[in-house]
Swiss-Prot record:
Pfam families: Ribosomal_S2 (PF00318). Keywords: Ribonucleoprotein, Ribosomal protein. This is Small ribosomal subunit protein uS2. GO terms for biological process: translation. GO terms for molecular function: structural constituent of ribosome. The keyword Phosphoprotein does not apply. It comes from Chromobacterium violaceum (strain ATCC 12472 / DSM 30191 / JCM 1249 / CCUG 213 / NBRC 12614 / NCIMB 9131 / NCTC 9757 / MK). Gene3D superfamilies: Glucose-6-phosphate isomerase like protein, domain 1 (3.40.50.10490), Helix hairpin bin (1.10.287.610). GO terms for cellular component: cytosolic small ribosomal subunit. Belongs to the universal ribosomal protein uS2 family.
């Protein structure tokens, strides 16, 4: 079953509110309906089909066991990105994008290993022989690593696609993804450029209601793709049994 969002839901979430007209990026002109009170209004008749297309891509990817990394490190996006990525079992970055997270993944994997080792020490604190101060320092280090790497610690390799809230804020992420040929689904507001974004979603990237709508829609698409894949496996098994 498909759970594509509707035009009404987009309007209610304020997806159509862009930035102040003086901050606009002319490359977004084709997605802009007009302006009101010096605020650009995004044309939802453009946004809706583009978002549906992005969801369809994610469904196909998830049905083929693909991975979509959710990225949203600005204040309004953090909690939403973390919740929705966790709901659909996908990796996420919600704290700070560390340079090389994709392009230097080998080093990142070593940091994840270090995080796991230190956590294991903390869990067996009684038998380790560490004193109180050493354990406290260790706990601080684990918390710091967890903030940066917690969302990607179960990732088995590079993601197959990246879903980004606010392409201007996450420039570093997009540069790394492009270098590696990883497709990017990006929410692009009127003050940013759609260049280099494979699946452009023109929309408000500041409102938490709008951010929730995008993240939930992509997470739903992941779950639907996986469910479809499971149905196909079950159907194939039943056919084989019948034969």
């Amino acid at each position: 079953m498909s759970t594509n969002v509707t035009m009404r839901q987009m309007l209610e979430a304020g997806v159509h509110f862009g930035h102040q007209t003086r901050f606009w990026n002319p490359k977004m002109a084709k997605y802009i309906f007009g302006s009101r009170n010096k605020i650009h209004i995004i044309n939802l008749e453009k946004t809706l089909p583009l978002f549906v297309e992005a969801q369809e891509y994610v469904r196909r990817l998830a049905a083929n066991k693909g991975t979509v990394m959710f990225v949203g490190t600005k204040r309004q996006a953090r909690e939403i990105v973390r919740e929705e990525a966790a709901r659909c079992g996908m990796p996420f970055v919600d704290h700070r994008w560390l340079g090389g997270m994709l392009t230097n993944y080998k080093t990142v994997k070593q940091s994840i290993k270090r995080l796991e080792e230190k956590r294991a020490i903390l869990e067996g604190a009684g038998e380790t022989g560490y004193n109180k101060k050493e354990l406290l320092d260790l706990q601080r280090e684990v918390e710091k690593l967890e903030r940066s790497l917690g969302g990607i610690k179960d990732m088995k390799g590079l993601p197959d696609a990246i879903f980004v809230i606010d392409t201007g804020y996450q420039k570093g992420t997009i540069v790394e993804a492009k270098k590696l040929g990883i497709p990017v689904i990006g929410v692009v507001d009127t003050n940013n450029s759609p260049d280099g974004i494979d699946y452009v979603v023109p929309g408000n990237d500041d409102s938490s209601r709008a951010i929730r709508l995008y993240a939930r829609g992509i997470a739903d698409a992941v779950l639907e793709g996986r469910a479809h894949s499971l149905q196909e496996i079950v159907a194939a098994a039943e056919t084989a049994q019948a034969e």
